[in-house]
Design a protein with these regions (language model features):
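Short, cationic/aromatic linear interface patches
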Residues: 89-157
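Charged low-complexity intrinsically disordered patches
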Residues: 1-80
Length: 157
């Protein structure tokens, strides 16, 4: 007679399923072989493009945030995914990387200015910064023109 309450064997011991480990996002996004060398190269390129040394002088009190922005740009540029999520929309990674590698001192200054003027609660700062950086080249001039129009209405054409 077999014992229906046989607790000597676990169901998992008789399971023939093969292991399927979950790969974290970071493991999928980055190739670890030359990661630190590539990261350093992109970090140097980004710092040169945004004129990091000038930001250190003009935005000394904001350098922690500037460093976070640099890290976010480099992380995004090194992303191995085909698409990148920006402000609830998926964009081709090539477009996002191109825009991020074209960011300049003025764009970073604009993002810092927008961040300092923001009074609403930001739930996901990474998503917020990604969107601000991605949109900076397309919105910066319009933003400053609107500021001038507001401050000096006599100059409006």
């Amino acid at each position: 007679i077999s014992n229906p309450n046989n607790t000597n064997l676990s169901n998992t011991e008789m399971n023939d399923n093969k292991s399927n480990p979950i790969i974290s996002v970071d493991e999928k996004r980055f190739d670890s072989d030359n990661h630190s060398e590539d990261y350093q190269a992109y970090e140097n390129l980004v710092k040169k493009t945004i004129d990091y040394e000038s930001l250190e002088v003009t935005h000394h009190d904001d350098m922690r945030q500037v460093d976070e922005i640099v890290n976010l740009i480099v992380e995004t540029v090194m992303c191995k995914n085909d698409k990148i999520l920006i402000a609830s929309d998926w964009y081709p990674a090539s477009l996002v990387k191109k825009k991020f590698l074209m960011l300049t001192y003025s764009h970073i200054e604009y993002v810092l200015h927008c961040m300092s003027g923001n009074t609403t609660k930001v739930k996901n700062i990474k998503k917020y910064l990604l969107a601000a950086l991605f949109n900076a080249p397309s919105t910066m001039n319009g933003y400053y023109q609107a500021e001038v129009n507001h401050d000096m209405p006599g100059l409006v054409r």
